[in-house]
Design a protein with these regions (language model features):
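Intracellular innate-immune signaling modules
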Residues: 1-641
Length: 641
């Protein structure tokens, strides 16, 4: 276990990216409980909210202490913590925390009362989801070195099971009170084994028998889904400790009654951001300059709560400053991601044998567009992990998939998992969203109607838009952009919010020029962007003073803030300046403010480097909901009334 987990690979698992985990590890901010509204917004917007709001009841927890209970107020005894669910957005450090937890145990630094730790990543369990297994057989497949152990040892020893990446699961978990399992050798399909009990250690149960019997043997065969469910509920190996990690939107798959402790990884706080850059960048002067730049660019600064984004930023900024100390440094998310993509393409060019510039350009375009198509199609399906069949759907020959991952080593990764099956993913969800946005804009530029119509027909359960209507025959850019705004407003959990920011950013002419080697041509987008930003500003401000309460609450606070950040992504500062002037003025009661406008004002106050002298909520002409949304601004005010 020590050999497996002592090294951290930032980006793809290539030797040049290898770093000793103990050297670079920066303690993450893990709290007990969860931040307010964690399931109601896009993951990145959750980080925006975390950056603005501190909860006095937050209890920081070190990852090695997640099973250690704190005494409750008024009670000296500590309750037993058996099952922990840790939530956190993509790239926030869930898997690295698991890695550190195991490494410290293997090195004898923590949790020495534990005899065995077993890591069962859902991305690997997916590959055997249709198979029948006993727990004993499953553990042998994952850890062949256990071959000589008696299966009874699992019941006699202290065991920790770690289920990493519930959000990546394609397995149906079953939590029926009528089905119970408690033997580690009972064989079952992944889903069924979890919920049934059997008393014979060698019994093989069919699904039908499984539903009506109890299971208590680790050698009995069940479905993988049932097996996992039974471990989580404690019906199988009730003394085992369970740690489950998940992105927030998927965490509700497990009934709360089976969870003893809920934790949330909130990523880096302010000192930890700086610590990360100083650990990673050996040149102290360069590290200070990069930290200073990120602090000035607020959207970049907030995103650096996410460790993966810190890595992308340090990669880009180190490269730019190494080539030219006076280089213009990216100010927006889209600019940062474009530069990261260009760095990877240049690395590929240095390795590639082709010397003909035109052939090299064509090859780069084909590779990136293929990967971008995968990103777009899978984003529309809500997938972050892909298998061979998903790649074939986008026209990528699976025999070439390793070539693709080798070409853009930090963008698209291939991993061998159980039974040496391959799984594929982008380095981070946000990079998938960036490439998906690029692909949609690229399709617009080359007049490829199919992806445009596929996007138009995309809808969530909440979406009232007519999915039969195609985009305008002429496909004007403003039609595409305003359609994207509407789609993002109705997408579940804000899953298109960051995609929208990237789509607007990519369409900006200055960014088109950066991408000119990948686009067949650029187009004049200034008027389309002007019309789209006007549409966004009208939506934020609201038009009707007499709007009813339901209309007033149509845009959530997080959606309103994302729309505001979309304006900054295309470098439209007009609303930002208008709000700054409004807040400083004495004219708060002259104009009615929509709830969305109040969310944006609150966000601006909180993001300001300089605290507001006084915030008097009663002076604002708004609804009760609007006033409620202004309350969060008091965190950056010297006086509140």
């Amino acid at each position: 276990m020590k050999n497996k987990y002592e090294r951290l690979f930032e980006g793809l698992n290539l030797q040049e990216n290898e770093t000793l985990l103990n050297r670079i590890y920066t303690q993450l901010y893990i709290i007990e409980g969860e931040s307010e509204g964690v399931n109601e917004q896009h993951e990145v917007l959750q980080m925006e909210k975390t950056a603005r709001t501190q909860h006095s009841q937050d209890t920081p927890i070190y990852c090695n202490d997640i099973f250690k209970a704190s005494p409750e107020p008024g009670r000296e005894e500590k309750h037993q913590i058996k099952t922990v669910l840790t939530k956190g957005i993509a790239g926030i450090g869930k898997t690295v925390s698991v890695q550190k937890f195991i490494l410290d145990w293997a090195e004898g630094k923590a949790n020495q009362d534990v005899d065995f730790m077993f890591v069962l990543p859902f991305r690997e369990l997916n590959l055997i989801r249709d198979h029948q297994y006993s727990l004993d057989r499953l553990l042998l497949d994952f850890h062949p070195e256990l071959q000589d152990l008696d299966s009874k040892i699992y019941e006699e020893c202290k065991v920790v099971f770690i289920f990493d990446g519930l959000d990546e699961s394609r397995i149906t978990l079953m939590f029926s009170d009528a089905q119970e399992v408690s033997d580690v050798t009972e064989t079952s399909s992944v889903g069924v084994l979890i919920s049934k009990k059997v008393s014979d250690v060698t019994e093989i149960s069919s699904v039908g028998v499984l539903m009506s019997e109890k299971v208590s043997d680790v050698t009995e065969t069940l479905s993988v889904g049932v097996l996992m469910s039974k471990l989580m509920t404690g019906d199988l190996l009730p003394s085992a400790l369970i740690w489950i990690t998940s992105r927030p939107a998927a965490a509700n798959q497990i009934p709360s009654k089976y969870i003893n402790r809920l934790t949330e990884i909130q990523g880096f706080n302010e000192p930890q951001k700086e610590e990360y850059f100083r650990n990673r960048i050996s040149d102290e002067h360069q590290a200070s300059r990069i930290i200073s730049h990120i602090r000035r660019a607020r959207s970049l600064h907030i995103m650096c709560h996410i460790p993966v984004f810190c890595w992308i930023s340090s990669t880009v900024l180190q490269k730019l400053l190494k080539e030219d100390l006076s280089a213009e440094i990216p100010q927006t998310l889209t600019e940062m991601y474009i530069h990261f993509l260009l760095i990877q393409i240049n690395m590929r060019n240095q390795k590639y044998e082709e010397r003909d510039p035109e052939k090299l350009l064509q090859s780069n375009r084909e590779v990136i567009v293929k990967l971008a198509e995968v990103a777009f199609k899978q984003l529309m399906k809500g997938n972050v992990m892909f298998y061979e069949e998903d790649l074939r759907e986008s026209g990528i020959d699976v025999t070439d998939a390793s070539v693709y991952s080798g070409i853009c080593t930090e963008i698209f990764k291939e991993e061998s998992v159980i039974h040496q099956r391959k799984v594929y993913s982008f380095i981070h969800l946000s990079f998938q969203e960036f490439l998906a946005a690029f692909y949609l804009f690229y399709s617009h530029v080359i007049k490829n109607k199919k992806p445009l119509d596929e996007f138009r027909s995309y809808r969530s359960d909440e979406d009232p838009l007519d999915d039969e209507e195609s985009l305008d025959d002429e496909d004007p850019l403003d039609d595409l952009l305003t359609t994207a705004v509407d789609k993002a407003l109705w997408s579940e959990n804000g899953q298109l919010d960051l995609f929208l920011r990237f789509l607007l950013g990519v369409s900006l002419e200055s960014n088109q020029k950066l991408l000119q080697d990948l686009l067949t041509h650029t187009e004049n987008s200034s008027e389309s962007i002007r019309e789209t930003t006007q549409y966004i500003k009208e939506m934020i401000k609201g038009e009707d003073e007499d709007e009813d309460e339901e209309q007033d609450e149509f845009l959530s606070s997080e959606t309103s803030i994302n729309l505001f950040l979309c304006l900054l992504e295309v470098k439209d500062q007009s609303l930002s300046r208008e709000i700054q002037e409004f807040v400083k003025s004495d004219k708060h009661s002259e104009k009615f403010l929509s709830s969305s406008h109040c969310s944006t004002i609150s966000y601006m106050i909180q993001m300001s480097e300089e605290p507001l002298d006084e915030l008097n909520l009663m002076k604002y002409n708004t609804s009760a909901e609007g006033r409620r949304r202004l309350i969060s601004a008091v965190i950056n005010c010297r006086k509140a009334l």
